[in-house]
Amino acid sequence: VIRRLLLWDIDGTLVRAGQIGAGAFDLAVADVFGRPAARRPVMSGKTDPQIVREYLGIMGETEREETVGMILRRLEARLAEAADQIPAVGHACPGAAAVLERLAGDPEVVSSCLTGNIAPNAVVKLAAFGLDRWLQL
């Protein structure tokens, strides 16, 4: 019987991926529009779709679900391409691996994520530091 469900945030709680995630956003937007954004929106505390919508505003583009979806697909591809760079510029947050490993051994606890990242990117960031093995995603 599961008695506790623990939901973890990823960015800043379990891992820090350096500027790889932000760079993937920049590249995804440029892939779709053929030009870079004039600036990067504040990303902290937002979901990936929210960030995409802010990029659309910066780009002066109309917000369409089709466009949001295209950018999110490119974001997924761009982060996957950069996955091997994440460990070099980022890190697992102190204590994250130890607490997740300990909780994984408790049959009354399930650890998962509640994050603003799209699901594939959540896995990429966690896997970069081997944390995905202790979470039910």
Tell where the protein language model's regions lie, with residue ranges:
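Short beta->alpha linker loops
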Residues: I20, T47, H91-G95, N117-I118
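Metal-dependent phosphoesterase signature
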Residues: L56-A98
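Substrate-recognition/cap helix-loop segment adjacent to the acidic, metal-dependent catalytic center
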Residues: A30-V32, Y55, M59, E101-S112, ...
